[in-house]
UniProtKB/Swiss-Prot annotation:
Family: Belongs to the RimP family.
Entry keywords, A to Z: Cytoplasm, Ribosome biogenesis
Primary subcellular site in the record, as a coarse category: cytoplasm
Role according to the record: Required for maturation of 30S ribosomal subunits.
Subcellular location: Cytoplasm
Family matches, as Gene3D superfamilies: RimP-like superfamily, N-terminal
Coiled coil: none
Protein name: Ribosome maturation factor RimP
Record PANTHER family: RIBOSOME MATURATION FACTOR RIMP
InterPro entries found in the cross-reference section: Ribosome_maturation_RimP, RimP_C, RimP_C_sf, RimP_N, RimP_N_sf
Organism (species): Petrotoga mobilis (strain DSM 10674 / SJ95)
GO cellular component: cytosol
Amino acid sequence: MLTNKEIKQLIWEKADNVASKLGLEIFDILIKGSNKNKILEVVIDKADGYVSIGDCERFSKAFDPWLDEIDLFDKSYELVVSSPGLDRKLRGKADYERFKGKLAKFILKGKETKHPVVIGYIDEILEDQIKITEKDSGKLFNIDLNEIDKANLEIEL
């Protein structure tokens, strides 16, 4: 019997293969629920834009037969294919570069930080810093990349 970590790795490898054939990427894989009601959520992404419902459907149709064939779970499972969403998590330098000019929320590490949360536009990505223009004040922030605890896009209304 495989561990959840081993199952996730096996699923990731196959999902990545299927996704790349469809011009997609794997953003995350989550295994949720109890042994009786497993939910496998595959979060897909698209390097050149946003994921559509059609993208999710195409991935699901291409990936589901392999899951049924390999029979990784003891009981039945539900496959959920989704996108990272409009307020997607930003996972580092490559994402900051990709979403340059977009509004994002940065939660910083450390209790000593004057501004533990900064919401602003991603201006420039340097070797070990990111430059942000705060949304409300227009103030420029230089944030060390290693000081970022969490970051995600913000929905601009």
